[in-house]
């Protein structure tokens, strides 16, 4: 299929899943001072393609809707607070739309999750960097989420947290994220 052809050519996307939310990352473990340079039209377009193809191939969501968060406060306010959302994010979204993807944004990230808490969620939200998305996601999921890597030739899931060395061997770990990761990603 066309979706699987695109899926095999793109860089993987870390998708975090919990009941009521799927959140992907355009960049992963990039220092904050380097995030702006890492957000390019190609990087964002590739993440959008991989996310859309993965949602279709792995989760059976035809024609998924993807929301994209802005980089700067208030999604740059039309270039008044940095220009990345105007110069990089908007053109990448337009390009994705011309390819037939259903994308919207950039949305100001400071109020996005509160604003959409009581509305039907999109099929996925793309955060541009790690803490922009994972802070709100972890508040939302309360230990019930997992990480599902999109764009690989085999399914890959994991807990949505790090190694937790601080609690290792103390019998206090919460297994809900591991349980979510073990379930098939086609839920």
Model-predicted segments: where are they?
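Anion-binding alpha/beta catalytic cores of soluble intermediary-metabolism enzymes, centered on
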Residues: 1-84, 90-187
